[in-house]
């Protein structure tokens, strides 16, 4: 599936193309499929937003890091999956059919696609309504409002974990090496598998 502005339809010249494979699959198969499809993988990293989030494999398909594929390295919690629905998400068949999805921007603007474009409205103060419209829990909407308004106030605080994955290394090998020395990551993965 793709998520964000491509799914919502509010794209511009600076829009990223973000693809998510929502289930835990072997990343070597994903890399092989991308390369056989003519894509070049410019960089790879393991990222984890917080100690309680699933670690994810990120594959960047261009030097500017505007096109990426993400694969969870352990099963997502429901709130983590709702994160993508909050921003808007569509499947490949929906993308091919030019279907767009409602979703919210990082500036906390709800984008509702229309036949002629889209309608924009604020999220803050309408969390219950936005959750209902997007088919997500109020918990994810309030979490995103909290995180994104905090980001506006104090700036980005960064990721909990970022591990580069070199050519010739698999995500799974690098993750296992880190698990062996990181008790917090080990606990997170033990609770998911």
Q: Model-found features: residue ranges?
A:
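Catalytic core of pol beta-like nucleotidyltransferases
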Residues: 2-13, 23-193
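Short active-site oxyanion
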Residues: 16-18
């Amino acid at each position: 599936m793709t998520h964000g502005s491509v799914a919502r339809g509010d794209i511009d010249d600076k829009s990223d193309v973000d693809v998510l494979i929502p289930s835990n699959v072997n990343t070597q198969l994903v890399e092989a499929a991308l390369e056989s499809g003519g894509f070049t993988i410019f960089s790879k990293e393991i990222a984890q937003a917080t100690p309680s989030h699933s670690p994810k494999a990120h594959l960047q398909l261009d030097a500017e890091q505007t096109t990426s594929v993400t694969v969870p390295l352990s099963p997502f919690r429901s709130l983590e999956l709702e994160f993508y629905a909050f921003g808007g998400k569509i499947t490949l068949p929906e993308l091919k059919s030019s279907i767009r999805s409602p979703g919210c921007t990082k500036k906390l603007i709800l984008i509702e696609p229309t036949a002629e474009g889209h309608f924009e409205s604020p999220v803050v103060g309408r969390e219950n309504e936005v959750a209902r419209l997007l088919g997500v829990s109020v918990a994810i909407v309030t979490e995103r409002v909290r995180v994104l308004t905090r980001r506006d106030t104090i700036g980005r605080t960064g990721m909990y974990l970022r591990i580069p994955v070199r050519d010739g290394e698999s995500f799974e090998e690098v993750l296992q090496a880190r698990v062996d020395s990181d008790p917090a990551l080990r606990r997170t993965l033990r609770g998911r598998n």
